[in-house]
Every structure is written in C-alpha cells, then in structure tokens.
Amino acid sequence: MAQVAKKILVTCALPYANGSIHLGHMLEHIQADIWVRFQRMRGNQVHFICADDAHGTPIMLKAQQLGIEPEQMIAEMSQEHQQDFAGFAISYDNYHSTHSDENRELSSLIYSRLKANGYIKNRTISQLYDPEKGMFLPDRFVKGTCPKCKSPDQYGDNCEVCGATYSPTELIDPKSAVSGATPVMRESEHFFFDLPAFSDMLQAWTRSGALQEQVANKMQEWFESGLQQWDISRDAPYFGFEIPDAPGKYFYVWLDAPIGYMGAFKNLCDKRGDLDFDEFWRKDSEADLYHFIGKDIVYFHSLFWPAMLEGSNFRKPTNLFVHGYVTVNGAKMSKSRGTFIKAGTYLKHLDADCLRYYYAAKLSSRIDDIDLNLEDFVQRVNADIVNKVVNLASRNAGFINKRFAGKLADHLADPALYKTFTDAATSIADAYSNRESSKAIREIMALADIANRYVDEQAPWVVAKEEGRDADLQAICSMGINLFRVLMTYLKPVLPALTERTEAFLNTELTWDSIEQPLLGHQINAFKALFNRIDVDKVNEMVASSKEDMAAAVAVTGPLADDPIQETISFDDFAKVDMRIALIQQADFVEGSDKLLKLKLDLGGETRQVFSGIRSAYPDPKVLEGRLTVMVANLAPRKMRFGISEGMVMAAGPGGKDIFLLSPDNGAQPGMQVK
C-alpha cells in the first residue's frame, strides 16, 4: 500500500533585516532545505517559508543613521537576503516580511484573543530613558561599567568580560549607546503576557518526547527557576505595529516575529488560492509544523511561542529542530581574520553546492556547533564529490559515448551489486528523515568507494583494448553509470546544482523510487564536466575579500568616510607641533559671534587667550570652566576682530552639536607636554 502523503509546513528562523546573511546563517537554511528536498522526493506535500524580521529599535536607529526610512532599508535588505538564498538554491515557496498587512492583522488577532482570555496584564514599570533622543532604551542600548568586575563599556544586560547578568540600572556610570547621554529613570505602563499560566501545558509538551533531549533538559531548568510574565510592549518611538487601542504603544519585536511564520504562509495562501491557511494553523490541524532554529532562540520558540498559540486558540508546533553555531577554523567567525564571510561574498568565489555538501557531512540531529575548517573543506569536497562521485561518471561515460553512441547496455553486469546499492535506500532515507545528514553522507560515500573499486577491478581501459570484448566493455561502463545514478539520487537533496547537470547528462530525472529499475538500453548525453575542484586560491581570495568587505563597511559608517586621513608627514614635521595640557579658567560668549567661545587657559605658569569655534556644542560655556583640555601652544598668534587668539584647543567631531573637546586622563597637569 502506498504511503499517504503528509502535509508539512517548514520554517527557518527569520533573519533580522539590519544586516547581511553570513555563513553562520546559511547552516540553518541549508539544513532545512536538505530536509525539505528529501521530504518532497518522498512524495510529501511540503510548504517551505521564511521572511525577514523587520521590526525593532536596531532597525529604526540604523535607518536613521543611513538617512532613510525604515521601510526603504528593510525592502533593500529583503532583496539582498532573497538573492543570497536563491544563490544557495534554498527552495522557499514564499519569502515575506514581518512588516506586512498579513502580519499586522494576525498579531492584532492573537493579541486580542490573549487579552479577551485574560492573559494580558498591565502594570507600570520604571526603565532607563534617553532625554536627548526622547526614547526608552532597550538593555543592549545602555552601556557602562560592569557592577561585578568593573570592566568598562559593557552592555546593559550582561558583561562580556566576566559573564555576569544584571539590570541596566545596576551599571556604573550608564550611558545611552544611541546619544551618549546619561539616561534617567522614567515610568511607563507596559503590557505583559502571562506566561506562568501556561506552565502545566508547556511542561506536558516538554515531556511528550517530541523535542530534542537537549532542548527538553534546558526547558526543565527554566521551569525549575520559575517562569515570568513577558513584557510584550514598547514605547514610541519604535518601528513596528502599534498595539490596538493603545496609542504610543507598540508590539515588542519578539511578539510579532514568530507570528511572521503565519503571515508568510497566509501571504502564500492568498497568492496560490489552493491552500487553506486554517488547515495548517487551526487547533485540531493534522498537518505537521516544524521550525528550524538556532540554539540562541530556543527560549522564545519553546516557551513564549507555543503559549501564545495555545492562548489564542491556534495549534502548537509539531517540533523544533535546533542546531548549534558555526565556527571557522576552530574559532568564532572573525572580521579581522576574514572568516566572517557573507553569503554574497562566498558566492562570488565558490560553488554553493560545496558548502551545502560540507555542512551536510557534519550535521546531525544534535545541537552541536559545526566547524567550517577551510582546509578540510577543500580536501573533503574535492575527495568526495570530485574524486569519488563525479569521477565515477567520467571514467565510464567516455567509453559509452565513443564506442556505443551513448547507449547503455540492455542488462546489468552485476545485479547483486546493484541491489546492494538500492537496498541502502531505507537506511539513507531514515538518516535524512531524522536530520542525520552526516550519517547519510557516510553511507553514500561508502557506496561510492565500492563503486570505484568495482571499476578499478573491471578495468574498462584494459578491456577496451582487447579484441571481441565490446559487450563486456559496454556492460561494465553501464554498470558504473547506473551506480553513479543511484549515488546522485541519494545526494539530490544536498547537491541541487550538480543534480540538475547530472539529470541533463543521464537524460532522466532522478527520483527516489525510480532507482529500483536500472537504466537499461538507455540513451545518455555527451559527458561534460559536472563539477569543478575547489581551488585553494579561490578560498584564499574569499577570505581576503571578506577582510576587504569589513574594512569597506567600517569606512562607510565611520568618520573616515567623510574625513579621510591626510597625506603622510615626517616625524620632524610632527615634532614641530608643541601640544600642552591647559586648564580652562574662564569660558565666555563672544559678542557678535554665534560660533565662537573665548577661553582663558592656564598652562601652569602662563595664561593664554584662545577663541574656539565650539559654541554650537557648548551652549552653556560655564560647563567648561575647571576642565583640562589639550591645546597647540606654539601656533602663531592670530589677530581676529574680537581680539588675538594665542593658540588652538583640540576637539573632535564633524561640527555643529557633534564637537567633542579633548580631555587628558586623570593625573595630567597644566603645562605638561603631549607627546
């Protein structure tokens, strides 16, 4: 009896729309795509969707920095993301955005149902507020000194030096990462999702046996420490969806982000017309729903998301498929080393199938980190795909094309060997189905070794020279081609581009069920190179290009872009400049000038008068009095209509309000020379 086709909805975590896709992201999308392609080969009805996560403070602020509207920025980023995923042959049925009408409607619907069911609580909270920008600050937008280890320049939620976690209000000398201002405490009414109300349901889901053991164990730790109500609101200004009947309040990005899965599918349903949204999302849905995610967002997907769905009368996920991080050459991806590689940069230098294969050869169903060792990457791809698989076709196709006009023999030379290959279909299918692609690859490569050993032993290049053995030659080479066909059928979920070229060469589609019948008396096409070896130089160029990419990115966003470093001077030229520490004794407005301040500077025994164009940044000049600064002391006096300026104080910044007077470190005294 034929197996009934399953209806499956598969998602990947939504990439954030404020940055490019890199090879760390690609692990998840490749893993999911391999699984989806396998399920489709097995006859299941799979809908594969994703979207850009397009809301939140970081996107709002980055758009401001770029001088464009957030809508323009996320549209441009979506185009780049989709181009990268297409380059890696990720077979999405729909790629959407959380900033969509569908997502707005569904977010409002879910919120309204949660509120009607008593799961939304209101309470007033105190949080840090940036008085210059007029906005409440997320934890990651507050920086200061760690209250535990006293390390400076740490985020408002955890210390990257000692690992401590804390509230942003505990930071020593906190500053807004947006404006540099000292934040103040302000109260605001926020809306909370009552997550603890779903504790029993979530614990039962955890114990159901569906989740990965590592995920279930981690969830148990969270249950033991106690679930907390979840703040789902943010105050204006915020780029996102305004909460119904709550002017100036917006849904927190992590509320509408997972709803983006639903929004992307709803958009697909509306486009197609033959899909029923409710069939996949209603409470009693019999369809399967799987989320591929990284281990860093398990908390949201294993607790908040199923609870939100339960509380709003939608179905829960069938399962979460969680993976680890990507390291490169045994270390965290590094911009300085060129191992922080963007997907687009990779595609300019290498074939997407190479990375797909390497990740597949390392992935399992466990939440283990994957190391992309670039040397091993080159060796494994060349050894496995080129030397073992593609070489099997090239060793045999030449004889078939030249001696037999491209026609395969009408019988198998070794039916028992062929059956060994087709019998492996069950265990390889089980491996793919269970997301054990590394196990599948090991089995496939073991078969490839057997196939090549068969060709070595039969030695068609010797048979070709012997009189009267044409039939043997055709049978041997046809056997090799048929074994190649089986191998490529098993590799089809992993290597879509190579599969397409292989199908053109073999003049047949590769399907899982068709391998039971070998190609007999079949016409193949002329053999053309199916796959190129990885050139180490190309990998090195990619790494070098990644360094250049990051250098360019820094230049674009940093002050150097607008104010490049000037021509090199000699040390003797620099030595002529005499810079000294100066104490600002007095600072006053200059009558008749809206740009200048008049400063009286003490150099430790000598007093100077200096006119400085810093008034726009210091509207109250008295705040400068008593402060140490740096001045050029041997600059020739300059006669101005307001008086004589006897030097120059040092400041940084582009101008206007963004002028920053330089100050020396503690211990410096007036008159000291700066060297």
Swiss-Prot record:
Family annotation (NCBIfam families): metG, metG_C_term, PRK00133.1
UniProt source species: Yersinia enterocolitica serotype O:8 / biotype 1B (strain NCTC 13174 / 8081)
Protein name, UniProt field: Methionine--tRNA ligase
UniProt KW NAD keyword: no
Key words, A-Z: Aminoacyl-tRNA synthetase, ATP-binding, Cytoplasm, Ligase, Metal-binding, Nucleotide-binding, Protein biosynthesis, RNA-binding, tRNA-binding, Zinc
Residues bound to Zn(2+): 146, 149, 159, 162
PANTHER family per record: METHIONINE--TRNA LIGASE, METHIONINE--TRNA LIGASE, CYTOPLASMIC
Name of encoding gene: metG
Motif position, 'HIGH' region: 15-25
Motif ('KMSKS' region): 332-336
Lineage: Bacteria, Pseudomonadati, Pseudomonadota, Gammaproteobacteria, Enterobacterales
